[in-house]
Amino acid sequence: MNIKSLLAKPFASVVHRQIKKEQLTAVADQQSILNQLVKAAKGTQFGKNHHFDQITDYTSFKKAVPIRDYEGFKEYIEQIKKGTQNVLWKGLPLYLAKTSGTTSGIKYIPISKESISNHISGARNAILTYMSGSGNTDFAGGKMIFLSGSPELERVGGIPTGRLSGIVNHHIPQYLRGNQLPSFETNCIEEWETKLDKIVDETLGKDLTLIGGIPPWMQMYFDRIVERTGKPVIASFPNLQVLVQGDINFEPYTAKLWE
């Protein structure tokens, strides 16, 4: 067992215990967080338009802020894209996450400096909870491939903008950088087929233990591995143990990925 696997065990246990403890106060914690968010945002355009200064609990919040889709936020988003401050949150967002635009066009999702750590800790804690629950930490010392969008960002209204997975790539903890694949240069390739071939070049022959990404990207990667080697994926990566996915429904891809 390598040093990272040894260190991961006690750390995973501590995090898992803390999560289980927080489950006991989940409802009260949500009310507390709601109060904090409403208080912090009451001076924004959105807060003023929705009378945040009069919100005292979840019931009054629900009445003041009805559920809406992206179109209901679009007028606010357009202002943010022009560099207007204090629209949905204090100041300007740290990033704008841009969707692929496959349904209803490209959408821009503000990511505040207060929230970016949650994107990282959520994924980290999921893995640590798995470690604690299963007792399996061996994979922590192997190579980990994260299939993501390009980490290269453009600026919209002065705000760094790009795919959420590319944004998160900038915040991967330093202790995982040595395990991370593919390289930054390969991740920056925009054309998917070219990028996929480069990822295969960089990962074949490596001791891959974890893969993360959205199901269709993982499926295409595995298909390319089989195409390149003529062998099942497990023959190329016998120590591959953990698959981390998100963003879309996994079920339609289950049969193919488990082949």
Regions found by a protein language model. Give the residues of each.
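Active-site phosphate/ATP/adenylate-binding loop shared across adenylate-forming ligases
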Residues: 1-29, 34-51, 55-259
